[in-house]
Amino acid sequence: MTAMKDIYIDKVVVHMGVGESGERLVKAEDLVKQITGQKPVRTIAKRTQPAFGIRKGAPIGCKVTLRRENAEKFITTALDIIERRLAPSQFDRTGNVSFGIEEHTDFPGMSYDPTIGIYGMDVNVVLEYKGARIARRSVERRKLPADQKVNKEEAIAFMCENYRVEV
């Protein structure tokens, strides 16, 4: 296998959707900061949903993007929480992996606090080959050839080999 065919974790996005702004969102931001060690950014509603009481442009969640060592460390901890089991449906055709963690109290060092409650989160892992930057760079941007994109089977093999995940 050539160096350009080595798969690596580009980023890990940790998202906590609260569905409303206010005190619950502030608590969620504090939890994400404690768990990941980074300050989260707020996510806003793309459209109005009257059934849920959500207005377009209102903050309804928070997320953190982890890269390099922080991403590696977090993904190891998160996979331990879900007992290193993933379903094939959690991999998409472009090699991304997504799974949920039901309770923040499953993380080491976190305990239940009745004033905060229990929050769940989504974890999205983006896998890429080296050289994928040509599709995102600002100077001399190029399209990525199909064989230079990670597919579902390669993503499953990468996670099984490097993180001992059962699929």
Swiss-Prot record:
Stored Pfam families: Ribosomal_L5, Ribosomal_L5_C
UniProt-recorded name of the protein: Large ribosomal subunit protein uL5
PANTHER family assigned: 60S RIBOSOMAL PROTEIN L11-RELATED
Gene: rpl5
Self-association state and partner proteins as the record states: Part of the 50S ribosomal subunit; contacts the 5S rRNA and probably tRNA. Forms a bridge to the 30S subunit in the 70S ribosome.
Keywords attached to this entry: Ribonucleoprotein, Ribosomal protein, RNA-binding, rRNA-binding, tRNA-binding
Biological processes per GO annotation: translation
Family per similarity comment: Belongs to the universal ribosomal protein uL5 family.
Keyword DNA repair applies: no
Native organism: Methanoculleus marisnigri (strain ATCC 35101 / DSM 1498 / JR1)
InterPro entries tied to this protein: Ribosomal_uL5, Ribosomal_uL5_arc, Ribosomal_uL5_C, Ribosomal_uL5_CS, Ribosomal_uL5_dom_sf, Ribosomal_uL5_N
